Design a protein with these regions (language model features):
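Flexible "arm" and connector segments at domain edges
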Residues: 1-148
Length: 148
């Protein structure tokens, strides 16, 4: 398995997410952000890296991937809500390049998790700007780190 994301793949994921989102009449940015952060924490909980009292921490792979896919879905929804349609192609190129260049994302541990959570929440507390791409790319980078 290669650690790549193509422009076509990301375009297809965004298309699928848009089709899904178009069926939801009451979307709003605050709910998307809250859901995305909650799904991130739910995925982290499946890793159980912080449960040092367990002999074999970590939920089964299907559970982990299910939660990561939920996290990804809300990141894609967030991208569709905050990225202007005219800038979507540029955003896609930036995302694909970030995934290609970022090969050494550290595995999560308690301190790094808190830092990552701070990055997620800080983006919204301080106002969304072009650095939102650092948040939206996270599920892809974690997928490369944990499941490639």
């Amino acid at each position: 398995m290669t650690n790549t994301l193509t422009v076509d793949q990301l375009q297809e994921l965004l298309k699928i997410q848009k089709e899904f989102d178009d069926r939801i009449p009451t979307k709003n940015l605050n709910d998307t952000v809250a859901s995305m952060i909650i799904e991130y924490v739910e995925w982290v909980n499946t890793l159980e890296f912080f449960k040092n009292w367990k002999k074999t921490p970590g939920k089964d792979l299907d559970t982990q991937l299910d939660e990561l896919s939920d996290f990804l879905a809300f990141n894609l929804q967030l991208a569709l809500e905050v990225i202007d349609g005219n800038e979507l192609n540029e955003f896609i190129d930036v995302m694909v390049n970030l995934v290609e260049e970022q090969e050494d994302l550290p595995r999560l541990h308690s301190v790094y998790f808190v830092h990552a959570l701070h990055t997620l929440t800080g983006q919204f507390v301080n106002g969304i700007d072009s650095s939102i791409v650092q948040v939206i790319v996270m599920p892809f980078l974690y997928a490369n780190q944990y499941y490639s």
